[in-house]
């Protein structure tokens, strides 16, 4: 019973179908929508008013929303009824309004092999920016050429404001003289859509090179990569856009414009292995900056570099001078020195510091650290000679600082008369004098005087013996 009653009732779809396909309305002939004159009833479906779809008058046909069939001509009277729309074209030339979806022709999307249909709010990050106007306009004939020929210049820059400034800019879009725009960046940093706030008339699509750690992870596509993604209607924008994005480590990627893209060899290659030699900062004479030499955040890369060096040479970080065999008196060479200007007679020479001669495995130039070297013999025979490493600033030990060997007197004794026996006898005499002053209960000042007099007597005897041995007379 209930099913029969419900089946007899007509719904809104049946009424709409009867109105469109009735005897009074021939849908196949006119292909026009029903007029939306007057206020719509609650039972009827409302008609959306849009810049391209809208009602003119109750008795007149509407602008077709769908594309006309092939071979059909569009009457010019329909286009003349809308003088307020700028540059209104036929449905074939006019792009669809920026309403609900965007066709993204990108091969960088994961799992995509061709055009993909994405919602406008899916995977899109909105970045409000301000573009400073340039001095001249963009030359070019067609709108697409003008959009492609907008180069990146230094005099124009792209300012990324903070969140508070972005809210103020969105509330007052025409507050400043510069034309505010909104950049919608797809997730992954592959594309950027520049959208003007004042409307959807000025749309630009730009590409940004994504920063990949390894070029092997760069997604490939069988289809040719498009230069730009054309969305909506492209009009010449009298401004030059300069996009600069700074990565965390401080390096700036190369600027990319819409017309010229770097070729394959110009792309960033895999990261270089550090510690393979001197870093670029050290070779240029600067302090380390933005490199992975001494940064804890690059500890994994440093460990990999050390492991790679040890795989090539297990003794890469070992000292050049190793220990000799058990019972050996001298050290042995393990790598040798590589001196250029010092002649291997300075403390920074590994062989000289280890007190050994240079050998055939050394790579030094103009070496003077060998057994019969006159410079080395003269350096060893100098009175100011010190052991290597005893004095840090031993620049005066260089043979160039000496005019010749020191002149020695013929009557110079090879040894002195002051020996350990003489020192012990002198100390015994001083102790005996102190005990004598203590037994006599002398004052401290008198005891010091007696000890000093005894020391003078002992010293005079030593000098008398010294002068007598040299044949000198004492007056």
UniProtKB/Swiss-Prot annotation:
Observed phenotype of the null mutant: Male mice are infertile due to arrested spermatogenesis at the pachytene stage.
Keywords (A to Z) from UniProt: Cytoplasm, Developmental protein, Differentiation, Meiosis, Nucleus, Phosphoprotein, Spermatogenesis
Tissues of expression: Expressed in spermatocytes and adult heart. Also expressed in fetal brain, heart, kidney and ovary.
Any one of the GO BP annotations: spermatogenesis
UniProt superkingdom: Eukaryota
GO cellular component, one term: male germ cell nucleus
Domain spans labelled CRC: 263-372
Residues bearing PTM Phosphoserine: 34, 67
Pfam families reported for this sequence: TCR (PF03638)
Functional summary from the UniProt entry: Essential for normal spermatogenesis and male fertility. Required for the completion of meiosis in male germ cells.
UniProt record similarity statement: Belongs to the lin-54 family.
Protein name (Swiss-Prot/TrEMBL): Tesmin
Species: Mus musculus
Gene: Tesmin
């Amino acid at each position: 019973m209930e099913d029969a009653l419900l089946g007899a009732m007509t719904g809104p779809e049946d009424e709409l179908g009867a109105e469109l396909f009735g005897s009074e309305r021939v849908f196949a002939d006119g292909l026009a929508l029903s007029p939306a004159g007057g206020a719509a009833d609650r039972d009827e479906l409302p008609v959306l008013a849009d810049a391209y779809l809208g009602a003119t008058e109750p008795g007149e046909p509407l602008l077709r929303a769908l594309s006309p069939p092939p071979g059909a001509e569009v009457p010019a009277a329909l286009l003349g009824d809308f003088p307020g729309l700028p540059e209104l074209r036929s449905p074939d030339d006019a792009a669809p309004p920026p309403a609900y979806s965007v066709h993204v022709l990108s091969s960088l999307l994961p799992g995509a092999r061709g055009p993909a249909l994405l919602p406008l709010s899916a995977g899109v990050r909105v970045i409000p920016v301000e573009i400073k106007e340039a001095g001249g306009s963009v030359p070019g004939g067609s709108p697409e050429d003008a959009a492609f020929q907008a180069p990146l210049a230094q005099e124009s820059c792209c300012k990324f404001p903070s969140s508070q400034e972005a809210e103020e800019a969105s509330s007052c879009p025409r507050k400043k003289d510069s034309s505010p725009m909104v950049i919608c960046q797809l997730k992954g940093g592959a594309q950027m859509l520049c959208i003007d706030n004042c409307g959807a008339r000025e749309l630009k699509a730009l590409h940004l090179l994504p920063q990949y750690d390894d070029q092997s992870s760069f997604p490939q596509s069988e289809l040719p990569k498009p230069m730009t993604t054309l969305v909506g209607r492209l009009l010449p924008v009298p401004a030059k856009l300069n996009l600069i994005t700074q990565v965390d480590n401080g390096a700036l990627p190369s600027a990319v414009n819409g017309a010229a893209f770097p070729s394959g060899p110009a792309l960033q290659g895999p990261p270089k292995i550090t510690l393979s030699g001197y870093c670029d900062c050290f070779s240029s004479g600067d302090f380390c900056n933005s490199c992975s030499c001494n940064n804890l955040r690059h500890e994994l890369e440093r460990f990999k570099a050390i492991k790679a060096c040890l795989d090539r040479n297990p003794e890469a970080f070992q000292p050049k001078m190793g220990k000799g065999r058990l019972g050996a008196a001298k050290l042995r060479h393990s790598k040798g020195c590589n001196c250029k200007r010092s002649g291997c007679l300075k403390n920074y020479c590994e062989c000289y510091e280890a007190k050994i001669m240079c050998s055939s495995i050394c790579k030094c130039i103009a070496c003077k650290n060998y057994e019969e070297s006159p410079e080395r013999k003269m350096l060893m025979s100098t009175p100011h000679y010190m052991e290597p490493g005893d004095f840090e600033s031993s620049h005066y030990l260089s043979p160039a600082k000496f005019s010749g060997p020191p002149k020695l007197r013929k009557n110079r004794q090879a040894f002195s008369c002051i020996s350990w026996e003489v020192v012990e006898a002198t100390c015994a005499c001083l102790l005996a004098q102190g005990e004598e002053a203590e037994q006599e209960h002398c004052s401290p000042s008198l005891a010091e005087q007696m000890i000093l007099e005894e020391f003078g007597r002992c010293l005079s005897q030593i000098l008398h013996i010294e002068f007598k041995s040299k044949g000198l007379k004492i007056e």
